[in-house]
Swiss-Prot record:
Species the sequence originates in: Arthrinium sp
Any one annotated GO CC term: membrane
Gene name of the encoded protein: atnA
Function statement: FAD-dependent monooxygenase; part of the gene cluster that mediates the biosynthesis of the meroterpenoids arthripenoids. The pathway begins with the HR-PKS atnH that catalyzes two chain-extension steps to form a reduced triketide, which then primes the SAT domain in the NR-PKS atnG to initiate three more cycles of extension to give a linear hexaketide corresponding to the polyketide part of arthripenoids.
Cellular localisation: Membrane
Taxonomic lineage of the native organism: Eukaryota, Fungi, Dikarya, Ascomycota, Pezizomycotina
Entry protein name: FAD-dependent monooxygenase atnA
Length: 751
């Protein structure tokens, strides 16, 4: 007979009650301690349930009940400080359900907790008015003893702290760890708890807000959020989030009603709806409270057999609505870990338990740190943290398509999530979640990012450095200047093609790579060998976080994808024809820079025309699919074929003469150094790109084989063809690894 294993959950919030249901479903013995007299008090405002949490709630059988008392977020609205609409999309809920299987729903915290509690079968395992005062742990593998304020004692194999920001379990874990293993808890865990914002939350009845959906109102150093309650109830949840004058370190005591009233009076005239001010909303409110918004993510969330989850382990800014959903994710992961340990007969194996909890700690630290950073960025933008954020919020983002500017960013918060492995799977949408993907993106370490930036920089500088070290040469190679100029121009076609493709990726929308034209203009002015390394270094920096790979990696504009090849032919027709005819026109070299700049403009104009004529599909079916890949393939293949033909022709005609001149003579010519720098950069970029694909498990191709192919193709076909080929290869690998299957089919292969 198996040795009994008991879990003691401290805290009856979303995390604790969800975990209790999961442990029952998996057949584990547990007890739950809650210090309040009611497991579902009518306190707090609302809870937002996003697809990553909804799918787990569906697995444990409470989602349908939640929906009965919840309001779906069908539309997205954002208002300026003057009350004008800057963003409106009535299809948000429909699109989210299509993509991820579930809409966002909003319900009262009371109803959420009540539904979770009602689902629990063994209600005798729930103990109210049990405030934990002390925890004792023995040697690894021994049981923990938990004492409560009323003198009760509980024994468990694993104690899970889910008792919120002001956690007694966390305090006990720190006390025990500091006593037994000083330094185990990093100082930044204790000093990293900070409150940057304060919120006033409330519930209003018939305040005059439009029914359905949610609304956000932007303002200087503050923002607002409103959401309708159950349809037909007339109830609206609202909140004001305002930035503190200075960040407050540590756990913040509860704030007074006087502080709340001061904020309400200060911002009473703020427009938060059409014809509605904060003062008017407050007059219609039946409940309001003030809370400090504390933020932190602990590096250490367990010691021996004490584990922290939910707001005990991390506290996120609520603007992104991921607090409760992250708690549900953590509960599901704990339940899965215990199931797997039981399957391996390792529940009482101290080493096995430590390893499992370490993996939990590492995974959740990465996940919740990303969520915290994302939420903080959203709040900074909505509250105009600086002039740049204000400009983006009011003048840039509202002009971008909703499916490009918002849905991919929302999706990147949902799709890294797990669900429960050992229960029937939840509903699936068009986008895969992390467990369904071959790729396993993790954040790249700062050291790796810096190392690759240094590597790319050295590659760019290498030819120039060698030139300085080698003996001076008097040869100027006058007969080869036109050859070098032509070769540089052909390489620039491949480089600008890469830039244009990348500029249509949702993951680079708010980055220096959002448009290719500035980079091309800079290259024409300063030189391609000076601009390309800067671009590639920015790309390395932009892709270091997990969110980059959970955002669609393909072109968001099918019209632009279809226009790539025709526009390439149009833009480069004149310099191409003049070159093919061996023209001696002195203005030939002037046509290439013009063509480089014309190409992205033609792509943009063509895509705008195609969208205006409704000649291409639009919306989520394009943004979240790889339907653009066939058009990218044709485009990059054309570049590879033409550039390799130029490479082979020039090598055939001039290779022997160039070899006779020698390295010293070649590197004495500036154009030759430019070519060498670009070639070294392209090889270095290919090396980095294959390493990155291996790092995120997007390919199983060995690095030695991949790097050999890059070097050989660069020598035989030229760097421009090598760049085009490596770019397309990486797109195909990402498409397979992220399971982004086409949602619409290309039309008869015509572009």
């Amino acid at each position: 007979m198996a040795t009994p294993f008991k879990v003691l959950i401290v805290g009856g919030g979303v995390a604790g009650l969800s975990l209790a249901i999961m442990l029952e479903a998996y057949g584990f013995d547990y007890e739950l301690l809650e210090k309040h007299p009611d497991v579902a008090p009518k306190l707090g405002a609302g809870v937002g349930l996003t697809p990553n949490g909804a799918r787990i709630l569906d697995q444990i059988g409470v989602w349908d009940s939640m929906c009965e008392y919840a309001s779906p977020v069908d539309a997205g609205i954002a208002l300026s400080p003057t009350g004008n609409t800057v963003i409106f999309n009535p299809h948000m809920g429909e699109w989210l359900e299509k993509l991820f299987g579930y809409k966002i729903h909003f319900l009262s915290r009371h109803d959420c907790l009540r539904i979770l509690f009602d689902k629990i079968k063994q209600k005798s395992n729930i103990h109210l008015r049990k405030e934990v005062t002390r925890i004792s742990v023995g040697q690894p593998g021994e049981k923990a003893q938990v004492e409560t304020k009323d003198g009760s004692t509980y024994i468990a194999d694993l104690v899970i702290g889910a008792d919120g920001v002001r956690s007694s379990v966390r305090n006990e874990l720190w006390r025990i760890a500091d006593t037994e293993k000083p330094g185990y808890i990093p100082n930044r865990d204790k000093s990293g708890i900070v409150s940057i914002y304060t919120a006033v939350i409330g519930i209003a009845h018939d305040p005059g807000l439009p029914r359905g959906g949610s609304a956000r109102a932007y303002n200087h150093l503050r923002s607002y959020f409103t959401q309708e309650g159950v349809e037909g109830s007339g109830v609206f949840y609202w909140w004001l989030c305002t930035k503190n004058e200075e960040p407050i370190k540590g756990i913040v005591p509860k704030l007074s009603s006087d502080t709340k009233q001061t904020l309400l009076d200060k911002y009473a005239d703020d427009q938060i709806g059409h014809g509605l001010t904060l003062g008017g909303l407050y007059k219609k409110s039946v409940y309001s409270a003030i809370i400090p918004l504390q933020e932190f993510v602990l590096e250490k969330c367990f010691y021996k057999n004490i584990l922290l989850i939910g707001d005990t382990f991390r506290k996120l800014h609520p603007v992104a609505g991921q607090g409760a959903n992250s708690a549900i994710e953590e509960s599901a992961l704990v339940a899965d870990i215990l199931w797997q340990l039981r399957e391996n007969n390792a529940l009482h194996d101290a080493a096995g338990m430590k390893q499992a909890l370490t993996e939990f700690q590492e995974e959740r630290f990465v996940r919740t740190t990303a969520l915290r950073e994302d939420a903080n960025l959203v709040q900074r933008m909505e509250s105009f943290d600086n002039l740049f954020m204000k400009f983006l919020s009011l003048h840039v983002i509202p002009r971008l398509p909703f499916v490009v500017a918002f849905l991919p960013q929302l999706g990147s918060a949902f799709t890294p999530a797990r669900c429960m492995k050992y229960l029937p799977p939840p509903k699936a949408g068009m986008c895969p979640f992390s467990p369904d993907m071959q790729a396993k993106p993790n954040p790249r370490s700062p050291l790796a990012t810096i190392s690759w930036i240094v590597f790319l920089t050295l590659a760019a500088c290498f030819p120039w450095s060698v030139h300085r070290l080698l003996p001076a040469s008097s040869s100027s190679l006058p007969g080869f200047s036109e050859v070098f100029q032509l070769y540089t121009s052909v390489m620039a076609v491949s480089i600008s093609g890469l830039w244009v493709i990348e500029s249509y990726k949702a993951s680079l929308l708010i980055s220096p790579m959002f448009s290719s034209l500035p980079w091309i203009l800079a290259s024409n002015y300063w030189g391609w060998d000076k601009t390309l390394p800067v671009y590639l270094c920015f790309h390395v920096i932009s892709s270091q976080h997990t969110v980059h790979y959970y955002t669609p990696q393909f072109m968001t504009d099918l019209g632009a994808a279809k226009a790539l090849l025709p526009c390439l032919a149009m833009a480069y027709s004149i310099p191409g024809i003049l070159t093919a005819l061996a023209s001696t026109d002195q203005t030939l070299s002037d046509w290439w820079p013009v063509a480089h700049c014309t190409f992205p403009v033609l792509v943009y104009v063509s895509s705008t025309f195609l969208r205006g004529m409704k000649a291409v599909p639009q919306g989520v079916e394009v943004v979240f699919s790889s339907v653009d890949l066939p058009y990218q393939r044709r485009f990059l293949t054309a570049i590879a074929v033409v550039s390799s033909a130029v490479h082979v022709t020039l090598i055939w005609n001039h290779g022997a003469a160039l070899l006779n001149e020698g390295i010293i003579s070649l590197l004495s010519v500036p154009l030759a150094r430019t070519l060498a720098s670009l070639t070294a950069l392209i090889v270095a970029w290919g090396i980095y790109m294959t390493w990155e694909m291996r790092r995120i498990f997007a390919t199983e191709v060995s690095l030695v084989k991949a790097w050999a192919v890059i070097l050989v193709s660069t020598v035989l076909l030229g760097p421009a063809a090598s760049l085009a080929g490596a770019t397309y290869w990486s797109k195909v690998m990402l498409e397979k690894a992220t399971s982004m299957q086409p949602l619409v089919q290309p039309t008869n292969g015509k572009s």
